[in-house]
């Protein structure tokens, strides 16, 4: 395994849970500690141009071992884990030769069940790495880090022909800031792949267009006994606002290429209320229409209010569908598809119902689709990964690197 599993277990021992709404990047010190550890590991392994930025981004180069010119490619994974669930004191469990049925997670009542997660039926005989039911696992995306480094080490030791390969490990992907301070010019690759996907074979170059929406509602509070014609209940206005949105266009009612409105939080009193939404859609025109709809609803619900009472809406775009950029470079996808086929893997092309660092990087001039890690059920206690999936990811990374050099020689 060339330390693949050892690396992974080492990386998940770092608590790198990201924090939302923090101005600094990285948002947590644990990410910086892992970045420093990776910097040292890469230096020890003999990588060149190993750097660690002020914002916790690690970069390094595996130098070419061929004499002909080869395009510089890159592989990228992220340091942080989801803010939605604890990543502290992760205690991975190894289940060898999975035979089906429920898997106990630690000593409590938590189980990983094929009833809830039918994908387990496809993984009989595999080696599973699970949580102990108290934390997430961190395969998203420390598996990606372990797979990239292991692939680079194997390329070097086995003398597989390859050009210059750049690797990078970024902070705060889970809170949408992973690419904010990524220096594309310094990375200096013609294209790259994030290793941040799910099950074996996943290859993704489409993601949501995404925006966050903050709504502030100011009402007027008086004694309810004498409130007629005077009270303006901010909570009632918030309720009216939400009810104007389509009930079947929410995350729990959508899949595939469907977009949605998602109310993430609501709080308030009669005097004042706040609502926070995210808006997602694959189609740019539909995305713009969703945002316009939210503004129009605010105008309708707020119409006729006393001038001291109002509804304020602020919309911030987060990222866009990288398909717009990737389709200009079809060879990047074709190369990954061929690499998977050469590794006896059927490529599974599917849209990302979320975002990756690659989405933002693609709009910064670094086309960057996403490939699988072998993991499942991210962001919670049921997260798990298969050792076979991890090995397959390593093989695909190596084959992409080899094919790039081979095609450059033939062209």
Swiss-Prot record:
Stretches that traverse the bilayer: none
Q: Which UniProt keywords apply?
A: Aminopeptidase, Cytoplasm, Hydrolase, Metal-binding, Metalloprotease, Protease, Zinc
The top EC class, named as a word, is hydrolase
| Cofactor note text | Binds 2 Zn(2+) ions per subunit.
* Its EC number(s): 3.4.11.4
Active site location: 80, 173
Recorded hits in InterPro entries, A to Z, give: ArgE/DapE_CS, Bact_exopeptidase_dim_dom, Peptidase_M20, Peptidase_M20_dimer, Peptidase_M20B
Q: Which SUPFAM superfamilies match?
A: Bacterial exopeptidase dimerisation domain, Zn-dependent exopeptidases
Per its UniProt record, what Pfam families does this chain match?
A: M20_dimer, Peptidase_M20
Q: State the superkingdom.
A: Bacteria
Task: Name a single GO cellular component.
Answer: cytosol
Q: Which GO terms describe its biological process?
A: peptide catabolic process; proteolysis
Q: Which cofactor does it need?
A: Zn(2+)
Where can this protein be found?
A: Cytoplasm
Which family is it part of? Answer: Belongs to the peptidase M20B family.
Q: Which PANTHER family match?
A: PEPTIDASE T
Query: Could you identify this protein by its name?
Result: Peptidase T
């Amino acid at each position: 395994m060339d330390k693949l599993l050892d690396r992974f277990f080492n990386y998940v021992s770092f608590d790198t849970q990201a924090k939302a709404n923090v101005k600094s990047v990285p948002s947590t010190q644990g990410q910086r500690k892992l970045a420093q550890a990776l910097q040292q590991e890469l230096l020890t392994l003999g990588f060149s141009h190993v750097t660690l930025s002020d914002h916790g981004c690690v970069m390094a180069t595996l130098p070419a071992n061929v004499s002909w010119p080869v395009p510089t490619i890159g592989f990228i994974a992220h340091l942080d884990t989801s803010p939605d669930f604890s990543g502290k004191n992760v205690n991975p469990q190894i289940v060898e030769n999975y035979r089906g049925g429920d898997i106990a997670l630690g000593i409590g009542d938590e189980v990983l069940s094929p009833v809830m997660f039918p994908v387990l039926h496809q993984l009989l005989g595999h080696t599973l790495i699970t949580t102990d039911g108290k934390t997430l696992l961190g395969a998203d995306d420390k598996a990606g880090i372990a797979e990239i480094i292991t692939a680079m080490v194997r390329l070097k030791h086995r003398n597989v022909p390859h050009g210059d390969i750049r690797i990078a490990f970024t902070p705060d992907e889970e809170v949408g800031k992973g690419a904010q301070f990524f220096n594309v010019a310094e990375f200096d690759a013609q294209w790259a792949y994030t290793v941040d996907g799910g099950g074996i074979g996943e290859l993704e170059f489409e993601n949501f267009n995404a925006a966050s929406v903050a709504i502030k509602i100011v009402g007027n509070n008086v004694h309810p006994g004498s409130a007629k014609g005077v009270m303006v209940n901010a909570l009632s206005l918030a309720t009216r606002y939400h009810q104007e949105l389509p009930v079947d266009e929410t995350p729990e009612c959508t899949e595939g290429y469907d977009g949605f409105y998602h109310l993430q939080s609501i709080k308030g009193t009669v005097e004042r209320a706040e609502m926070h939404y995210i808006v997602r859609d694959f189609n740019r025109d539909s995305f713009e229409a969703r945002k316009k709809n939210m503004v129009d609803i605010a105008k309708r619900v707020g119409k006729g209010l006393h001038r001291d009472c109002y509804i304020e809406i602020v919309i911030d775009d987060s990222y866009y569908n990288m398909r717009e950029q990737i389709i200009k470079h079809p060879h990047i996808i074709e190369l990954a598809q061929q690499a998977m086929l050469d590794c006896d893997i059927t490529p599974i092309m599917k849209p990302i119902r979320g975002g990756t660092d690659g989405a933002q990087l693609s709009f910064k001039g670094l086309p960057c689709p996403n490939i699988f890690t072998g993991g499942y059920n991210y962001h919670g206690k049921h997260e798990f990964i298969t050792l076979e999936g991890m090995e397959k990811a390593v093989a695909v990374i190596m084959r992409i690197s080899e094919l790039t050099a081979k095609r450059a020689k033939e062209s």
